[in-house]
A protein has these predicted regions:
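Alpha-helical substrate-recognition element adjacent to the catalytic core
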Residues: 2-126, 130
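C-terminal cap/substrate-recognition subdomain and adjoining C-terminal extension
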Residues: 82-96, 103-212
Length: 212
């Protein structure tokens, strides 16, 4: 199926989608408190805390200076193949590309710049990297009428949305998209509910599926 031009946006999750490893998890596990990290991850999976509560508690023990964190990320991050090609593919069709993330703009923007990816919109949270513990500055406090929590759905643009994601933070937003490419936890979630989605391993798969 060919998408109509002019009002189509490819919306990309960042952690675990653009990156091969979930950096939000990796930073908290490596530079925070590993015991706290595991406790809140388990609580998130059982539904006893929200995603926001999880991220807040995981980053409270992180005291690493932000420039050191960015340096570590740039030295170690691996991006999913085909990102630049997907952005070029979208631009050639006059589609927009938006990164919509539960992570931190202060991490995402340097990663994209280092990878030579520019001219795309980034919608993410911010972080106040205090020496006594990182404090998350949430992008949007509005509660979603669908899932009952503040979520990524509020960050979706108008028009047709092609959503590409991998995890818990992508669930509600993906349900609002016209077309969904999913991997890992998001793919399992949608499959268990019989909801339509297309699997992908890298962004070349997405390009191949979208190309006329």
């Amino acid at each position: 199926m060919t998408e109509s031009s002019g009002s189509t946006t490819i919306v990309l999750d960042f952690d675990g989608t653009i990156t091969e490893v979930d950096l939000l998890d990796d930073l908290a596990r490596r530079f925070g408190d590993s015991v706290v990290y595991q406790e809140v991850e388990d609580a998130l999976l059982t539904g006893t805390i929200t995603l926001r509560e999880c991220i807040t508690r995981e980053y409270e023990p992180v005291t690493m200076p932000l420039d050191e964190a960015v340096g570590w990320v740039l030295a170690n991050v691996r991006l999913r193949p085909g990102l630049r090609e997907l952005v070029a593919f979208a631009k050639a069709r006059r589609w927009s590309v938006r990164v919509l993330s539960s992570g931190f703009e202060e991490i995402i923007v340097p990663v994209l710049a280092d990878a030579g990816v520019d001219g795309i919109d980034v919608l993410a949270n911010r972080v106040d990297a205090r020496s006594e513990g990182w404090r998350v500055i949430w992008r949007d406090e509005a509660v979603c009428a669908v899932c009952g929590e503040p979520c990524k759905r509020s960050g979706l643009p108008e028009g047709e949305v092609i959503y590409v994601g991998d995890g818990i933070s992508d669930r509600c937003a993906a349900l609002a998209a016209r077309r969904v490419f999913a991997t890992r936890g998001l793919a399992r979630y949608l499959s268990e509910r019989g909801l339509p989605h297309e699997p992908f391993d890298d962004f070349h798969d997405v390009i191949g599926a979208l190309a006329p």
